[in-house]
Amino acid sequence: MKGILKKAMAAALVAVMVLSMSGCTEEEQPQTNQPQQEQQQDDGQQPETQQEQEEQSQQQTVTAPSLSQQLKEAKAKNDDIIGWLKIDDLKVDGAVVQAENNTKYERLNEWGQYSWTGTYFADYECNFDSRGSLSKNTVIYGHNVDFNDNRDGERFSQLLYFADEEFAKQHPYVYFTIDGDDKSSEMVWEIFSVFYTTTDFDYIRINKDYRNPQEGEITDAQLMNIIKGAQERSEYDYEVEVSGEDKILTLSTCSYKYGRRKDVRFVVMAKLLDEDAVLHTQAKLTQNTDKKTVE
């Protein structure tokens, strides 16, 4: 009988030990998880860092949209329409007009009808005959009609989204297409500067001399001065090479960041890319910590 009791007590003791081990907390079991963690590290399954994710995204490519059909249909309704402008994820997606002056379309839409918000209109001095004959500085204007710089407003109020670094990073290109019979008229422009400025900075210069347009368009040196001025004022330092030999696109609107001053503008500048350029999903940029600011 005693032998049977001893065996029963021994069995009970073993059962208690098993239950005790199975009730350990996670803090009491770090060593049992360690081999699994080490195996994960060996297999390279660790989460990617933000830098690695950005580098991977920058290696991905995108395809430019085709805007020729929209332009063709719009031009059939108004011969003043010379192009179609689009920026991904913004309301900026519409016809661009050009008149014999820069005032005709201030309060007209692209169909020539009255509109407080106007439309996108190109400077009357710009040339749009073909890709090869484009002006060195193609300037397009649009209204910002909200005195609070509401970036969700109409027309070029939307450009103010580029004041947000993450948005700027995710939107490296502007698409601007002109009338033409081949793919060369469908153009992609890579942004290299986003800035606030006063009109003292002559960033909209197209010809050498305003008084004598017959002298022709600005020189490479004059364009380079505009580019440098834009980069000095830019909210970001873009990793985009641009020179006076390039053709640039200038999108300009009013800004009320500094109150209701009439001389402040918000500008997005981009350079024309080659037809076979590879397009990436992100821009490489950093904050410009010593930018020239509006005074």
Show the residue positions of the predicted features.
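C-terminal motif of bacterial Sec signal peptides marking the signal peptidase cleavage site
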Residues: L19-G23
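Bacterial signal peptide processing site
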Residues: T25-E27
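Solvent-exposed, non-transmembrane regions of membrane-associated and secreted proteins
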Residues: Q29-E295
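Bacterial N-terminal signal peptides that target proteins for export
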Residues: M1-A12
